[in-house]
Design a protein with these regions (language model features):
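Metal-dependent nuclease catalytic cores that hydrolyze phosphodiester bonds in DNA/RNA
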Residues: 1-72, 76-83, 87, 168-172
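Generic secondary-structure transition motif, activating predominantly at the C-termini of alpha-helices
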Residues: 12, 23-27, 133, 137-140, ...
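Cysteine-cluster motifs in flexible loop/terminal segments that predominantly coordinate metals
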Residues: 8, 14, 18, 144-172
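Short amphipathic alpha-helical patches
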Residues: 31-46, 116-120, 153-163
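Nucleic-acid nuclease catalytic cores
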Residues: 57, 66-142, 155, 161
């Protein structure tokens, strides 16, 4: 199984979400937040698709790649910066490097914040990503889903109902 940017992102956020997604229990199609993210992606930079290339390689899909400058542009709908976004973009750079493309960098863009962050990949990042891949494989190949965690982020997660519906009924 190819590890995708989504796997890296979910690994940073919640191992249970990672396991559910990797084991074909996908709830994103019912999420208003995912839909909102797609809208922002499609409308924030409407002319961008003409200028950049979409790239699919080893299970990753990069929507905006500037081939001339070897720059990945990753757009996030969030109103705050998150490590999960950073590691997802670093993973894209890592995969391109593994496939012989050198000198790649990235930019994380947050239209809601009107902010951009340049992203580079260090040798320490490469080691960390290699370790993450091993840990992700261990998690997703496990017989059972990891235990749910209680975080404020859970409420906005597309898997919220899947994880918490029983507890919601008990407390009401």
């Amino acid at each position: 199984m190819h590890i995708t940017g989504t796997h890296i992102n979910y690994y940073q956020i919640c191992h249970r979400k990672l396991w559910l997604f990797a084991n074909s229990i996908q709830m994103e199609h019912t999420s208003d937040l995912v839909y909102e993210g797609r809208l922002i992606h499609e409308t924030s930079y409407s002319r961008r698709s003409e200028k950049y290339t979409e790239l699919e390689l080893d299970g990753i899909k990069i929507d905006y790649f500037d081939t001339k400058n070897k720059m990945i542009h990753e757009v996030k709908k969030s109103n705050k910066r998150e490590d999960a976004h950073l590691w997802q973009l670093k993973y894209y750079i890592y995969v391109l490097e593994r496939n012989g493309m050198t000198g790649v960098s990235g930019i994380l863009e947050y239209p809601k914040l009107r902010a951009r962050e340049e992203v580079l990949l260090s040798s320490i990042d490469r080691e960390e990503l290699s370790a993450m891949q091993n840990e992700i494989n261990r998690i997703i190949q496990s017989e059972n889903a990891p235990e749910k965690i209680s975080r404020s982020k859970c409420r906005n997660c597309s898997y919220f109902d899947f994880c918490w519906i029983g507890e919601m009924e008990e407390t009401e």
